[in-house]
Each structure stands twice: as structure tokens, then as C-alpha cells.
């Protein structure tokens, strides 16, 4: 039984969904993360830590069973927030002396929030697992008219049968997709969906779920868990990196190595990654905050040459000599990556399959690799346990710096080691939902670096572990959006993935991503127009992550204090770099509500794909 979170719509992180959507034959990260299911699923996480993506809303409420997935607050039949949602205002930062810059107060308080104390009472669970409405996919409030349904669909069906309402004929041949965000648009199709899933006046009953039905539902959940277990266990031997010895890094001595960490990490593993709260340290000075955050951003959020364990000169020399990477397995074996002579062929096939699936929308595509580019696929972990995507050497044009290259060197060739999967690992004949999921999955390896960056924010580890996880779950998508804003070419209306493959806005819009991509382009244009330095970008990223108004915080006062410290440092740095542009800091802060809006749009887009895949 697939589970979802009925939390607020104040934002969250990237959620990666299965192609089966909310089919009862498959499980979801949300159900596997609940307290009661952890016991039966413990065998998965012990031998092979798996990536369970974070919740789009990102709030870690008092109920652990609702830690994953997202649904913005339930709406009534008239589109207004239902009784299960309540609005709460975020506290104003004392940094603004009670009056933040224009628009920021509204931006940080936009959207309705679900009070943890109220929302948990209206959620139906089975052994700790949240159940979904059979009609629209919202969180079920109980067993109504024969099926698990939300309050909105229960009331809609009750009015329909009691008043014998004859709804207007559907304009789309009665083929409307009924999801939470559009369930009020076509009432005829909604009533038809109610009947098709089994809602009936004769099915009204009182009391608890019968034992026989409860056992059947538990059996479905267990079979879904076993299926996920089998799939992950078959992948586990291929994903386990070699044990590495600690080596002192630029940020100080490395901690003792963890026993063979998996390249993919889930938010259920955060308590093992994050340090327990320590005694409050003396408040650092503004200069210390700027230097520490900038250094962490530079050394963690970089496409650094040293992450591959080889210098750019040596790498380029190997390619200049005409040696194919596939014919030099000793170079990769020395770094813990087994020789794979067919990696290039398989990688090219997967990439071409993904392109062929997208070419149906348009026939004008750039070549998969730029002329002269050399490619090798080796998903190897670096010294920090990060999973690196294939490396590429791109010749820069004569007299020009490489486009979108995070670092500019003296050499004409630039070594790019990105923390993202460079292309979807798909198959031919995929649906739009599957292609969208593949693109979302391309962000997976970057999540680990967000965790690592957070640990180096001064004062972050002083927070409780609960608040650390809550901030990470809620802010990871926004951090990644800031980080990859440079990949959006506003002038040409294209998106360049880190494989150097460029997709036009029109092509991706044909897949149903138009509104979300337009908002991403607008945000990228605004952010890039500020021309932030590396230090400013690092501090702004920290401010985005440490937001005191996230729902589910245990000690919001401590988070707010840390946020004020980061804001003071960011303001001092911005005014120091450009003292004449006094409004630059305010413009930068006004990007926070834009990020929150993007977060909400991304959450609803993934939710609609999940329900459509039923």
C-alpha cells in the first residue's frame, strides 16, 4: 500500500517516485520509513543502504510515519483548505528589527500549513502506515462508503447520492484524471471515479477494520516490501564501494571510515550521517562564518579535479596519447573501480535510448556529445564517499573559457567531475512519467553533498538531530535549485545537463513540465542577474537551508538564531563586495519565496505523476 504525507505546502525536497505510482503492488519510501515498517524492512537498510528520497514538503512531524512523501494541505470541495489544515505564521527575524524587507514577510508565510497536532488526528493508518484516498490520492481520513477516502471525496460522494445530483456532461469524453489538485474540475468524472473504486451507499459500516481485510492489506504491504527487497539486494553488490582509509583533507582530519557506505544515501540514514547535538559553541564572528561557509561550499560543492584522485594533466595526457579509457583498466582499478570494457557502449546505449524517447516531441536535437569530447563511464566513489558521474574532457574554444564550467583553468581541456547522474538510465518505449522520474533521479547523488555541506555550517551541528534532519528534508530541493541555476540558458531557452546535452524548453514542455520549467527559468534568470561571487553563493545556500519557518521543528528558536547569524554574515559580505548597491541584499532575500514556490510546484508535479500512474 503506497503511503503519502499530508503535510503543508511550504516546500520540500526532490521526491523520486516509482513508475507504478500508487499501485498497491508496489511500496513507497514513505511506507518503508514508518516506525512499524522499519522492523520488517530492516534487512534492506543493514546490508545495502538504499536511497529513500526526501519529502517535497520536508517537514518531519511528530508522527514518524509521515516522514516521506508530500501532499499539500487537503482542500475542500470548494477549493478552500479543509479543517485538517491550519495557517501558522513564521516568526519575524529580529535581524529585521521587526520589519523585514518588502515582500519577504509574505513570502516566508505563504501557503497553508498543517498543524502537526491537528493533522495526525485525521489520518488513517494501518500498522503505522498512512493510507491514501482511493479516488484522488489524498491522505485518507477513514473508511467511507466502502473504501478508504479523504474528507473531500467522502463529502462529495455523500452529497451526490443524498441529493441525487445530475452533473454536467464531461467535455473530455469522461477521461479526466482525478487527482487532489484538480478533483473539483470535472464532477462527473469524479463521481464516476468514486463508483469505479467501489464507493457505495450500501457499503457504509461502523467500527474497526475487519480482521480479514486488515490481514489482506498487511499481506499486500509485505509483498510490496519483499519486492523492493529483492530489487535492492540484486543491486547491492554492484553499488558497494571499497573501504577507504581516512586521509587528512583540506577541512581537517577525516573521521574514521564508515563500513562500506553505499553511494546512494537516503534520508532514513540521516541520523547515522549527522552528528548528535553537541554543547553550544561560542558564537562565531561574522568573518569566521563567511570563511567557514565559503570554504565548505568551495570544497564540497565543487567539480574538483582532486575528487578523481588524478591531476587534470595526467588525465588529459592519457587521452592525448590516443588511449581509450576502456583499454586502460589499471588506472581505474587503482581507485577501486573494476575494469568495465563495455561501460562506454552500455552508457551510450542508455543515453541514446533516453534521447530517442524525447525525440518524439521534436526532431531537432544536438549531438549527444560535443565534437572532440571523450567519455568514460565509471561510477566510482571519491575520498568523501561521493558517487561521481562519468568524467568528460571538453576542449574549450580557442581563446574562450568553457561554458558553464565551475572552474576555469589555464589548460584548454577542462576536467568535469559532477556529482549528478549525467543522463537517465532508461529503456526504450518509456512513458512520460518514467522519463520525468529519470530526470528527477539525476539529482540523486547530489543529495549527499548537501548533507556534507550542512555539517560544515557553523552552528548546524549544535541543533538537535531532529531539527537537522527536518531542515535537510525541507531544503534540499531549494539548495539544488540554487546550485544548478547556471545550467538554465535563459537567452536560448535551453537546459544543459551536465553531460553537455541540451534540451529546449519546448521539448521538455511537451512532456508536461512547462509551468515548472518556466518558473525555473525565471528564477535562474533573476539569480544569475545578481552575479553572486562564490562566497556569496555559499552563504546564500546556507541561508536557504537553515530556515526557521520549516514545519515540524523541535527548537525553532535555535534555528532562528542560526539563521540570523547567517543573514548577518551574508549582509556584511554583500555590502562589502558592492557597497554602492544597497538593494542587492534585499533582492537576494526575495529569492527565498521564489524557491519556496518552485518547491511547491515540484511537489505537486510529482504528486500528479504519481496518481496518474495508477
From Swiss-Prot:
Domain NR LBD: 285-614
Region (Modulating): 1-129
Region (Required for phosphorylation by CSNK1E and cytoplasmic localization): 1-70
Subcellular localization(s) per the UniProt record: Nucleus; Cytoplasm; Cell projection, Dendrite; Cell projection, Dendritic spine
Keyword Repressor attached: yes
Chain intervals for the UniProt region annotation (Disordered): 1-120, 233-286
InterPro entries per UniProt: NHR-like_dom_sf, Nucl_hrmn_rcpt_lig-bd, Nuclear_hormone_rcpt_NR1, Nuclear_hrmn_rcpt, Znf_hrmn_rcpt, Znf_NHR/GATA
Residues bearing PTM Phosphothreonine: 275
GO cellular component: cytoplasm; dendrite; dendritic spine; nucleus
Transmembrane intervals: none
Residues noted as binding heme in the record, renumbered to the chain: 418, 602
UniProt DNA-binding region: 130-206
Biological process annotations from GO: cell differentiation; cellular response to interleukin-1; cellular response to tumor necrosis factor; cholesterol homeostasis; circadian regulation of gene expression; circadian temperature homeostasis; glycogen biosynthetic process; hormone-mediated signaling pathway
Tissue: Expressed in all tissues and cell lines examined. Expressed at high levels in some squamous carcinoma cell lines.
Domain of life: Eukaryota
Positions with biased composition (Polar residues): 1-48
Chain segments carrying region Crucial for activation of GJA1: 49-285
Sample GO molecular function, one term: zinc ion binding
Post-translation changes: Ubiquitinated, leading to its proteasomal degradation. Ubiquitinated by the SCF(FBXW7) complex when phosphorylated by CDK1 leading to its proteasomal degradation. Ubiquitinated by SIAH2; leading to its proteasomal degradation. Rapidly ubiquitinated in response to inflammatory triggers and sumoylation is a prerequisite to its ubiquitination.
Positions of modified residues (N6-acetyllysine): 192-193, 591
Biased amino acid composition, Pro residues: 239-262
Purpose of the protein: Transcriptional repressor which coordinates circadian rhythm and metabolic pathways in a heme-dependent manner. Integral component of the complex transcription machinery that governs circadian rhythmicity and forms a critical negative limb of the circadian clock by directly repressing the expression of core clock components BMAL1, CLOCK and CRY1. Also regulates genes involved in metabolic functions, including lipid and bile acid metabolism, adipogenesis, gluconeogenesis and the macrophage inflammatory response.
Family, similarity comment: Belongs to the nuclear hormone receptor family. NR1 subfamily.
Entry note about domains: Composed of three domains: a modulating N-terminal domain, a DNA-binding domain and a C-terminal ligand-binding domain.
UniProt subunit comment: Binds DNA as a monomer or a homodimer. Interacts with C1D, NR2E3, SP1 and ZNHIT1. Interacts with OPHN1 (via C-terminus). Interacts with PER2; the interaction associates PER2 to BMAL1 promoter region. Interacts with CRY1. Interacts with CCAR2. Interacts with SIAH2. Interacts with FBXW7 and CDK1. Interacts with HUWE1. Interacts with NR0B2. Interacts with NFIL3. Interacts (via domain NR LBD) with HSP90AA1 and HSP90AB1.
Listed name of the protein: Nuclear receptor subfamily 1 group D member 1
Species the sequence originates in: Ovis aries (Sheep)
Taxonomic lineage of the native organism: Eukaryota, Metazoa, Chordata, Craniata, Vertebrata
Amino acid at each position: 500500500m503506497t503511503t503519502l504525507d499530508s503535510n503543508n505546502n511550504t516546500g520540500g525536497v526532490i521526491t523520486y517516485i516509482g513508475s507504478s505510482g500508487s499501485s498497491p503492488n508496489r511500496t513507497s519510501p514513505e511506507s518503508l520509513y514508518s516506525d512499524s515498517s522499519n522492523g520488517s524492512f530492516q534487512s534492506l537498510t543493514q546490508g545495502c543502504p538504499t536511497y529513500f528520497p526526501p519529502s517535497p514538503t520536508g517537514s518531519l512531524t511528530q508522527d514518524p510515519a509521515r516522514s516521506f512523501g508530500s501532499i499539500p494541505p487537503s482542500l475542500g470541495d470548494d477549493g478552500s483548505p479543509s479543517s485538517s489544515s491550519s495557517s501558522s505564521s513564521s516568526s519575524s527575524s529580529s535581524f529585521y528589527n521587526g520589519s523585514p524587507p518588502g515582500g519577504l514577510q509574505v513570502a516566508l508565510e505563504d501557503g497553508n500549513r498543517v498543524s502537526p497536532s491537528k493533522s495526525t488526528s485525521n489520518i488513517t493508518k494501518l500498522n503505522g502506515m498512512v493510507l491514501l484516498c482511493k479516488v484522488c490520492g489524498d491522505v485518507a481520513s477513514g473508511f467511507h462508503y466502502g473504501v478508504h477516502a479523504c474528507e473531500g471525496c467522502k463529502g462529495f460522494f455523500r452529497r451526490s447520492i443524498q441529493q441525487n445530483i445530475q452533473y454536467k456532461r464531461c467535455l473530455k469524453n469522461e477521461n479526466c484524471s482525478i487527482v487532489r489538485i484538480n478533483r473539483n474540475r470535472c464532477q462527473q468524472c469524479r463521481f464516476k471515479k468514486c463508483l469505479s473504486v467501489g464507493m457505495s451507499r450500501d457499503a457504509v459500516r461502523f467500527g474497526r477494520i475487519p480482521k480479514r481485510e486488515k490481514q489482506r492489506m498487511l499481506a499486500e504491504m509485505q509483498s510490496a516490501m519483499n519486492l523492493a527487497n529483492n530489487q535492492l539486494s540484486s543491486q547491492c553488490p554492484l553499488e558497494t564501494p571499497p573501504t577507504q582509509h581516512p586521509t587528512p583533507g583540506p577541512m581537517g582530519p577525516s573521521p574514521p571510515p564508515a563500513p562500506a557506505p553505499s553511494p546512494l544515501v537516503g534520508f532514513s540514514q540521516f541520523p547515522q550521517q549527522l552528528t548528535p547535538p553537541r554543547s553550544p559553541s561560542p558564537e562565531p564572528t561574522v568573518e569566521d562564518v563567511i570563511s567557514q561557509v565559503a570554504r565548505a561550499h568551495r570544497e564540497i560543492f565543487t567539480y574538483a579535479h582532486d575528487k578523481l584522485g588524478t591531476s587534470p594533466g595526467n588525465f588529459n595526457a592519457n587521452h592525448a596519447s590516443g588511449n581509450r579509457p576502456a583499454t586502460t583498466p589499471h588506472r581505474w582499478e587503482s581507485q577501486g573501480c573494476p575494469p568495465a570494457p563495455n561501460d562506454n557502449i552500455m552508457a551510450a546505449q542508455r543515453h541514446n535510448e533516453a534521447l530517442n524517447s524525447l525525440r518524439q516531441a521534436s526532431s531537432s536535437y544536438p549531438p549527444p556529445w560535443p565534437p572532440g569530447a571523450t567519455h568514460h563511464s565509471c561510477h566510482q566513489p571519491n575520498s568523501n564517499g561521493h558517487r561521481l558521474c562519468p568524467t568528460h574532457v571538453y576542449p574549450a574554444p580557442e581563446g574562450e573559457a568553457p561554458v558553464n564550467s565551475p572552474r576555469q583553468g589555464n589548460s584548454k581541456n577542462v576536467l568535469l567531475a559532477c556529482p549528478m547522474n549525467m543522463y537517465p538510465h532508461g529503456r526504450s518505449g518509456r512513458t512520460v512519467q518514467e522519463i520525468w522520474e529519470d530526470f528527477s533521479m539525476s539529482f540523486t547523488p547530489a543529495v549527499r553533498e548537501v548533507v556534507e555541506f550542512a555539517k560544515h555550517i557553523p552552528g548546524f551541528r549544535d541543533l538537535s538531530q531532529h531539527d537537522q534532519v527536518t531542515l535537510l528534508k525541507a531544503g534540499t530541493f531549494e539548495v539544488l535549485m540554487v546550485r544548478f541555476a547556471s545550467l538554465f540558458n535563459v537567452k536560448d531557452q535551453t537546459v544543459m545537463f551536465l553531460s553537455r546535452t541540451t534540451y529546449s524548453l519546448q521539448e521538455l514542455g511537451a512532456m508536461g513540465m512547462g509551468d515548472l520549467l518556466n518558473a525555473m527559468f525565471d528564477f535562474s534568470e533573476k539569480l544569475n542577474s545578481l552575479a553572486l561571487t562564490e562566497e556569496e553563493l555559499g552563504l546564500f545556500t546556507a541561508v536557504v537551508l537553515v530556515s526557521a519557518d520549516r514545519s515540524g521543528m523541535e527548537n525553532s528558536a535555535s534555528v532562528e538564531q542560526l539563521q540570523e547569524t547567517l543573514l548577518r554574515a551574508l549582509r556584511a559580505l554583500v555590502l562589502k563586495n558592492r557597497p554602492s548597491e544597497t538593494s542587492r541584499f534585499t533582492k537576494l532575500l526575495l529569492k527565498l519565496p521564489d524557491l519556496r514556490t518552485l518547491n511547491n510546484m515540484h511537489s505537486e508535479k510529482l504528486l500528479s505523476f504519481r496518481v496518474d500512474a495508477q
